[in-house]
């Protein structure tokens, strides 16, 4: 396939008029059309890399923790329809016996139709019982290296991120022991600045949904956010215009940079469906518009109801984040953060031919996956 006359988001993180050539599923340097090759005129359209979501839970009534092929395929199909072509869905806080079936289902899944399953984000259960958010406090436990390794074996090595509250007893030791086996993310935590620094020095490299379920910044208690800033950590950001004020979103891009900000959806099973009652992590949630909350605790946000593409779009159109930065934060940066950037997250030669064509209002006009138009 050849895409001509597009305004292409280049590996230099700028937009330039150009042509994208895709052969055998991957982007190649410019080449003349072959006989019978499909040529698509993208005049007036942006060509964006397929997005990479490293933290979401569900959509269309299915949750990754359903632990079934049907659920995974539903998520893969939905995400692909929204231009998200590589997914690393997140688990919730459950006991090992429950997580076993989730890992088994992920390991058995074969990529083909829909977004590629490229990893698993193990969001629980190694978190703080005081900062569970929408996680189930009943199953919170200390970080357990043997348990992680058993789950990783069942998952066939798919676990790319493990979330840890470093202040909990033994959790710093887990970071020291396991950081060379998996990326460690600071999450659902009450940690202070000094303990967060120890966590990053021990090998943590990532922070889960920045600002949410963690202490904030004050001038006498800088907390984990400043520690992350000082230690080159990559940070997740939910830009659904519910979780974080637009000014704080802009502040984060200005301080961390788009090479360290990973936009995420953190969406629940309600994403893509009407308002109503759903569940997340075994707890009832109520959805109204873009806002999802625990039904029994309506002041507690329970994931989002927005897909990653729409989070990126809102960051640009509602929060005044530059398009170039928002695109990078939804594609290349998350791909790098979990080590799949040789295949995903960029329109550089050698990467998969995953392309979104969008108009100037960022409405999706086409989605191309590995050189095949699927939307």
Q: Residue spans of the language-model regions?
A:
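C-terminal cap of metal-dependent C-N hydrolases
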Residues: 6, 336, 346-375
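His/Asp/Glu-enriched, well-ordered alpha-helical/loop segment
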Residues: 224-235, 253-265, 271-351, 355-357
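Active-site gating loops and adjacent loop-to-helix segments of metal-dependent hydrolytic enzymes
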Residues: 77-88, 128-156, 198-210, 221-234, ...
